[in-house]
Amino acid sequence: MNNNFFNSDFDSILRRMMQDMQNSNQTSNKKYYINGKEVSQEELAQFTQQGGNHSAEQSAQAFQQAALRQQGQQSGNGNYLEQIGRNLTQEARDGLLDPVIGRDKEIQETAEVLSRRTKNNPILVGEAGVGKTAIVEGLAQAIVEGNVPAAIKDKEIISIDISSLEAGTQYRGAFEENIQKLVEGVKSSQNAVLFFDEIHQIIGSGATGSDSGSKGLSDILKPALSRGEISIIGATTQDEYRNNILKDAALTRRFNEVLVNEPSAKDTVEILKGIREKFETHHQVKLPDDVLKACVDLSIQYIPQRLLPDKAIDVLDITAAHLSAQSPAIDKVATEKRISELEHDKRKAVSAEEYKKADDIQNEIKSLQDKLENSNGEHTAVATVHDISDTIQRLTGIPVSQMDANDIERLKNISSRLRSKIIGQDKAVEMVSRAIRRNRAGFDDGNRPIGSFLFVGPTGVGKTELAKQLAIDLFGNKEALIRLDMSEYSDTTAISKMIGTTAGYVGYDDNSNTLTEKVRRNPYSVILFDEIEKANPQILTLLLQVMDDGNLTDGQGNVINFKNTIIICTSNAGFGNGTDQEYDDIMQEMKKFFRPEFLNRFNGIVEFLHLDKDALQDIVNLLLDDVQVTLDKKGITMNVSQDAKDWLIEEGYDEELGARPLRRIVEQQVRDKITDYYLDHTDVKHVDLDIEDNELVVKGKS
């Protein structure tokens, strides 16, 4: 076997190796390689036998051809389908699929398209989360049960991952070869139906450009689809169907569209009941009927940007997972081992006549046995409606509460809470409170916002402060307030700051700071349009739709829901100087600045009155309370005499400017002087504020 590649030394090495193999009884740990390929002992022996009659090149080539034949046999067309796909029909036979409820119509339409002689390719079109994949799983279950036309009663639905067809195809022609193997596999099986989720990905999939001559997946499949040699079920969204599939007319006519709409709330509850058992078994959590209904109702109310049943199922799954984590499963092995140890200790105690100790050990054994018994097949936790509310709060940040007795009392008292913060504006507070009570109690009509109000009046009387307090009272923090200063929206291009720019303009892809995007991210918000009279007329035109229909379409075509927002517009224009003006006077005055159709959209137009000195007495107390909150961080208490309060009111009172001068006086005379005193006496624990010689003085105690 002497040649350019091997010499006699290699022959001797090979003979010794074969002799060692024969003499050794332990062959399981030995591996043999030829040309980088792992081979068995028999293949190696065959190779050595051929070595005397053939050259090394011929022997290596023969071995490679044999290996390729073996690989081809192992990856036959039928097996190729199994390698890259899931057999949904087989999973249905094995009971691995969730039950599909309320989709009989869509399943029937899909089955009818599949039973056609040609162009038997249904495509399920619907928004994300409505259950397109579930319909295909329902069809697989219907095939197993025999509730389908005779033409497809023996079909096997194979779910194909498109990425698996592209994996490893680094050389030209490899992708096309995979597709041909797929098509041949379907032809040879004669009963396979391929299911492509996100089927829009087949457009251009595998193509490397027009100059390379490499075709994409859709181009390769078109002839087989039109002749009925291969049957495909597709699933995609409305947008992807319009932007990808419909642009290819030849591909579109080979598919038959099956529309999949969002199920109703009632159907979604039935869907949750159908899958409840699997979730209970998985999480070991009991899920009563009222919890299922709460999942649907609260997800509809607080997660409007997603669709049923997906969002309701997610809420149910997250809640059960959270409860399961709070009640971890008992470690059965460790517990049984501990019981065995305690039994041994008990016997020793009895032998030593330590009966009290033995009794204590027996009680511990009984406790562990009870835990084992309760955890063996039993649900360790029971979900409640309150748990669903907590899940919604974690997902959205909205403090969700149910209409229980405490919440009813809270709604009743909302006006008194607001009046304690907004001084001297009882009429405005009461009007806003009525709108909120009506909405939270569920007596609103249509899809309009919770409330829309126009606050008019002089500066510094509490218009903006009422909006802030509403955000805190309803949604828990000031971050729920979206404040827009209309002086920034006075030019003709300001509308792009509201809804974003349209296609073809700069900034089309970046709408992150627009009003519509802020509301989409935080659907429960108080929207404040400050000094609305300064806004461009186009802004007011947009607000007509928001206040009437409760939605707004942004520059990218997305419909944003404003149903759960409170819209407040403020204006300094046309307010009266008197304190006893009637509603008709305000409306008549506002018509000088705003169009009648704009004013007519508001739930209420409220005049904020000038503040008198009695109102400032309550306001100064609120401002001093804010100072005390700051001092609490330093561990300092504060006492302010009545003379000091009267002095602050006298210095800060201005009927035309409202409460803002008083805020400045408190900042300059109280905060600044306490700061100066603290810097000189860092160990101070208490400060007293009083008037001496018509001047505010600060005295402290350590």
Swiss-Prot record:
Keyword Transmembrane helix carried by entry: no
Spans annotated as Disordered: 46-80
Residue span, UVR domain: 336-371
An annotated GO cellular component: cytoplasm
Biased composition, class Polar residues, residue ranges: 46-55
Region (I): 81-332
PANTHER family given in the database record: ATP-DEPENDENT CLP PROTEASE (PTHR11638), ATP-DEPENDENT CLP PROTEASE ATP-BINDING SUBUNIT CLPL (PTHR11638:SF188)
Protein name per its UniProtKB record: ATP-dependent Clp protease ATP-binding subunit ClpL
